[in-house]
């Protein structure tokens, strides 16, 4: 019995490091991350009971922990919040890597990615080739992101779509 439990823990540890499917969302009721104030924060969870919080930011401030949620609902958008300064290499969506290169400000508004009919995420860029952002237009010139919130909108043409993000 102990061997089975040990094997289960070992498998859980290795699978948690991989890309996870985001199934639903809820609000935090309990967490185990030092130095964070997260109660009642909305989160997107990959497991009905627990979310492994593991950022991919390249920084000495990487945080890892477990979060329990009280309520669940069907996910409509996916938000990735990066609260420590660092470089974001890519967003992995069903094996499609997208390099982020946008100039950000602290406490910024979301940047939108749109899922096209083929299921590939595309950064929303206006007709002049700029990224509409905080009532300004920014060229894609930098990858230094002190605060990032990405919102992925599902294509309403597709009735069933799976949203997969690295970092959760």
Residue ranges and their predicted role:
Residues 1-4:
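Positively charged n-region of N-terminal signal peptides that target proteins for export
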Residues 13-16:
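C-terminal motif of bacterial Sec signal peptides marking the signal peptidase cleavage site
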Residues 18-21:
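Bacterial signal peptide processing site
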Residues 25-46:
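Post-signal peptide N-terminal segment of mature Sec-exported envelope proteins
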Residues 38, 81-83, 95-97, 135, ...:
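Extracytoplasmic
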Residues 48-77:
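Mixed-charge, low-complexity intrinsically disordered segments
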Residues 76-115:
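Mid-length scaffold segments of soluble, non-membrane domains
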Residues 121-168:
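C-terminal partner/receptor-binding element of secreted or periplasmic proteins
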């Amino acid at each position: 019995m102990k061997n089975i439990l040990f094997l289960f823990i070992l498998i859980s540890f290795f699978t948690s490091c991989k890309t996870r499917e985001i199934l639903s969302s809820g609000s935090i009721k309990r967490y185990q991350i030092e130095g964070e104030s997260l109660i009642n924060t909305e989160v997107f969870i990959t497991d009905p009971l627990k979310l492994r919080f593991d950022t991919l930011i390249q920084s000495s401030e990487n945080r890892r922990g477990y979060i329990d949620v009280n309520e669940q609902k069907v996910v409509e958008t996916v938000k990735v919040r990066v609260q420590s300064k660092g470089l974001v290499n890519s967003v992995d969506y069903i094996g499609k890597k997208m390099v982020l290169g946008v100039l950000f400000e602290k406490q910024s508004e979301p940047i939108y990615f749109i899922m096209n009919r083929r299921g590939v995420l595309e950064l929303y860029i206006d007709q002049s080739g700029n990224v509409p952002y905080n009532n300004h237009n920014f060229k894609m010139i930098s990858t230094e992101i002190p605060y990032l919130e990405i919102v992925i909108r599902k294509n309403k043409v597709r009735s069933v779509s799976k949203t997969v993000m690295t970092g959760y």
